[in-house]
Amino acid sequence: MIKRALAPIVQPQRLFAALMVIGGGGRSATTTTTTTTKACGNGSSQSPPSTPLLSSKSSTITSNKKSAIPSSHLYIPKKSTLDSRQIGNYSREYSTSSSSSSKKSIFNDTYLNDLFWQLSSQGPAFEVNPNNIDFIQEPIDFYNHLIDGVKRSKKRITMASLYLGTSKQEIELVKEMKLAMERNKELKIHILLDGLRGTRIGLDKESSATILGELLSLYSDRVTISMYHTPDLNGILKKVLPPRINETIGVQHIKTYIFDDDLLLSGANLSKDYFTNRQDRYVLIRSTSTVSNYFNEIVEIIGSLSLHVDKDNRNQLLLSSGSIDPVTQSNEFKNLAYTKLSTLLKSHSYYPSNSNSNSSVDSPFDCNNINNGETTWIFPTIQMGPFNIRQDEVVTSHIFESVPNDSKFFITSPYFNLTENYLNLILTGKPKLDIITCSPQANGFYGSKGLSSAVPDCYAIIEKRFLQRVQDTDNGDRISVQEYIRDKWTYHAKGLWIQVKNQQHPSITLIGSPNFGSRSVEKDLEAQIILITQNKQLQQKMENEKNYLWTDTQNANLELFEKRKVSLMVRFLVYIFGNYL
């Protein structure tokens, strides 16, 4: 009993992650202070809910003996994942019914068509006008779109981010929100941040909560500032881990920015470096209420589970009356979160591009542009390990495993430390694969102080070991790695692209907050979209975005690593704690 009670404290992965942030977390290192939280209720931390990925109320999928993800390839990190619906066990009745449209394909390409049905078995599908989709390239353009979105909004502004910075650009963004509230009496604002990161005090004695405090005080009836608190930080851990270190247990990591019916989805936070010289990815989906409403609902549900900023004491978080405390009622909190969020995962639900409601249709053939040969679909995915919601992990695993041999596959990951599942799927695949990650100089921790200064070298060792495994598995001619290197810039872009045979440009991209690592899978709240299209203009935009990221890169090979000197201490840290990075 004693060993079990002490296990969370001495768990080496948590200990190392905590030590890593002592002394700085990269270019935006700050000082810390303890956050005061008012909470009510009693309870204790329990194991996560063992319910399957989708609730019993969701439509079920006919079981096939052969899974699209071979059990020899798919690493199951938790027993509960065994209860999740395996991709490949979908019912083809949706594509082989007796209706007049049943013999038609969604996409002309066989792989795209099969992938469509696989993904629709795991959650809703949204038809989108491809002319309404654009990819942003520069951080400054990301910031300008945020400012412009705030200025244009008439009914809602919904933002989810890890945190809001405290520099001039962030203050200007909040100022524009105040002006927008003055101009539009019907406008409502909801901002969801991580409660631990959002109340951390910086060198300027400010935090996300204090920067937003005046906006909340002026318009408390129309402004909501939600602060998510992970239920995994409880008990002794809650008492002994100081601010900054406690963030390693789990955070709200979704990055979505909604302005009326426009959605800007990214991996970028609301911070100066993400507005200036930290390269990320950003997709803008305009005038598409169905997709915007879906992501707005994600934020609303998480917000309903979160603590809230006290307008009278801006760095203090309050628990709403009747709410479940994530700290003292951890198990109840997880069960409630699962129940609420799993309602989003409605399989075989199709939303037409011209729909002004949240109503879906029964068949994708009832949508508008299904017969023009250039249809475009978006599949949102969420990953919330603390609540046992693993939709993104399941579909990403399937994509890694199912990419056709004659396709071109591209992955970007700034912190390249794939889960063992993803790594095995990549190494046993056959398509040509190009990977881009950050060089040590482009790592966000480069130049920081304390143990965190070792982070770039830790990732360099992991990258070298990956290259060695590529060689050892005879994948040297198939898999290549590039490193992003740009003077005074850091790299934070995440996602992938797939270019199928007989296509000149990518037809598929994944973009959002997940990073393909164990932290994204197990600890944080994540969301992204899978975009599939045969529209030539949109494919060209996807190609341009991909090529832009590859512009400032250098080839990474084993010879390069022979020139990099890594201390024995760093090697020891990776040897002991590498699976957690």
Curated annotation (Swiss-Prot):
Protein name per Swiss-Prot or TrEMBL: Probable CDP-diacylglycerol--glycerol-3-phosphate 3-phosphatidyltransferase
Function statement: Functions in the biosynthesis of the anionic phospholipids phosphatidylglycerol and cardiolipin.
EC number: 2.7.8.5
GO biological process: cardiolipin biosynthetic process; phospholipid biosynthetic process
GO MF term list: ATP binding; CDP-diacylglycerol-glycerol-3-phosphate 3-phosphatidyltransferase activity
Organism name: Dictyostelium discoideum
Residues of the PLD phosphodiesterase domain: 248-274, 487-520
Family listed: Belongs to the CDP-alcohol phosphatidyltransferase class-II family.
Catalytic activity: a CDP-1,2-diacyl-sn-glycerol + sn-glycerol 3-phosphate = a 1,2-diacyl-sn-glycero-3-phospho-(1'-sn-glycero-3'-phosphate) + CMP + H(+)
Name of the gene: pgs1
InterPro entries: PGS1, PLipase_D/transphosphatidylase
